[in-house]
Amino acid sequence: MELIEQVAVAKKANIYFEGKVASRSVFFSDGSKQTLGVVLPGEYEFSTSQGEIMHVTSGSFEVLLPNSSTWQAFSEGSQFELAANVSFKIRNNAIAEYCCRYL
């Protein structure tokens, strides 16, 4: 298991889509922030306010990236990058987890 050490973690979760997506904010001493999330099976659309890198930490997602008409598969250990101010969709058939690093 990979660990994130010497951080502060928000006690309150960020809850989306009627509880089907939940994440916790993790704050680093250098001022940066990441979120660790769990996604129940379904299809969801998100928007970014800043650039981010999404790391799939367990399970898998299909992702419809901005300006694309083709869903792409991302499994555990893979990642994809998103620009600021874009929308994208994810879907999954089983519980999956991610770590989002903000750029």
From Swiss-Prot:
Pfam families named in the record: Ppnp
CDD domains: cupin_PpnP-like
Keyword Transferase set for record: yes
EC number(s) recorded for this UniProt protein: 2.4.2.1, 2.4.2.2
Statement: the UniProt record of this protein carries the keyword Glycosyltransferase: yes
Catalyzed reactions: a purine D-ribonucleoside + phosphate = a purine nucleobase + alpha-D-ribose 1-phosphate; adenosine + phosphate = alpha-D-ribose 1-phosphate + adenine; cytidine + phosphate = cytosine + alpha-D-ribose 1-phosphate; guanosine + phosphate = alpha-D-ribose 1-phosphate + guanine
GO cellular component: cytosol
Enzyme class, spelled out: transferase
GO MF terms held by the record: guanosine phosphorylase activity; purine-nucleoside phosphorylase activity; pyrimidine-nucleoside phosphorylase activity; thymidine phosphorylase activity; uridine phosphorylase activity
Taxonomy, superkingdom: Bacteria
Keywords of this entry: Glycosyltransferase, Transferase
Similarity field: Belongs to the nucleoside phosphorylase PpnP family.
Function text: Catalyzes the phosphorolysis of diverse nucleosides, yielding D-ribose 1-phosphate and the respective free bases. Can use uridine, adenosine, guanosine, cytidine, thymidine, inosine and xanthosine as substrates. Also catalyzes the reverse reactions.
UniProt name for this protein: Pyrimidine/purine nucleoside phosphorylase
